[in-house]
Amino acid sequence: MKKYNIPFSPPDISDGEVNEVIDTLKSGWITTGPKTKELERRLSEFTDTPKTVCLNSATAALELTLRVLGIGEGDEVIVPAMTYTASCSVIYHAGAKAVIVDIAKDSHEMDYDALADAITENTKAVIPVDLAGIPCDYDKIFEVVESKKHLFKANSEYQEKLGRVAVVADGAHALGSTYKGKKIGSVADFTTFSFHAVKNFTTAEGGSVTWKENENFDNEELYREYQIYSLHGQTKDALAKTKAGSWEYDIVIPGYKCNLTDIAASIGLVQLDRYPKLLERREDIINQYNKGFEGTRITALSHNSDSYKSCGHLYITHVEDATFEQRGEIIVKMAERGISCNVHYKPLPLLTAYKNLGFDIENYPNAYNYYVKEITLPLHTRLSDEEVVVIIENFKEIVEEVVGE
């Protein structure tokens, strides 16, 4: 048996990113500064949004959004069972209560009927998750929250301005995806993105938040609120304080420390230059996979439809009729051949943290059935066409061996 060396998701870093980081290191300004501001401006151009705030993670971006919205004790936020913990843990960080809903049968998206049923007078936000870069059905989500406006009770300035449950998209996987011709970022009320090392677009660690144009929002004031929350509650960042006579500042809230550095932003600036071609390569690999698995028991989530186009972050497959044990055996056998696979994700109610909060997987049968048969294959821009063929052939062979034709 031949042993390969195909990692799951290594970063794609060129000499361009390296040189840009060196330039920043030599510039004398390495924390939040001109390159972070430039990345924010360019990301807003890319997503067709009024402003972007870059932070040190998508998790921070999501939590700060809940804070800016004034969500806290006594409030409820709805999240799907099929997501990573970050989508949910931030709700507890903010002092609110998570309401976890099941996904729809034979789907990765939340059950929108269950979403409607879960909205109460205490609901302040819903966090849809664009899993694998595949946009949720935002028309349906907005239809649901609009239909429940009569229940909504605002208790903060931005809640008043929205006048309904906020749609706060976890777009960690979805930078570059589109929904009905609109870039993700300009669809939900607020959208957070991840720039973690394994993401399509990386700053090593990092993330951002943006929002769609809203006539009730003062974009500069909203941007300033995020800045204050992200830097200890301080009214000026380090760059602003360097201006002559500008040392004076105030601390207006006991805030966080989650700003992005110019070193990280330097990576992002070059990544953004390269991003269109990186997305093209991902689409090409997805097409090769789809063709290779035709006529087998292996099915994949669809990255394109009449209403959306995914940025192709993950290639998520389901192996028809596989048991939990067989799924594990397939992943081990792939690893023995040097091909790294993953699972996205364990449903939240299967995790100890959420079991301890009273969630029971028996109440989430669709999420569990989705999870049991799921295997994620390598999908990254350092894969060669030859390696894609190797993955296809070995995966098909192992699935047939373990589960049958």
Task: Cite the ranges covered by each PLM segment.
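PLP-dependent aminotransferase-like
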Residues: R67, I71-G171, T178
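Structural detector of well-ordered beta-strand residues that form the stable sheet scaffold
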Residues: V53, I78, V99, A166-V168, ...
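Phosphate-binding glycine-rich loop
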Residues: W29-E76, V90-Y92, I100, K149-K153
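Active-site PLP attachment segment
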Residues: H173, S186-K236, D262
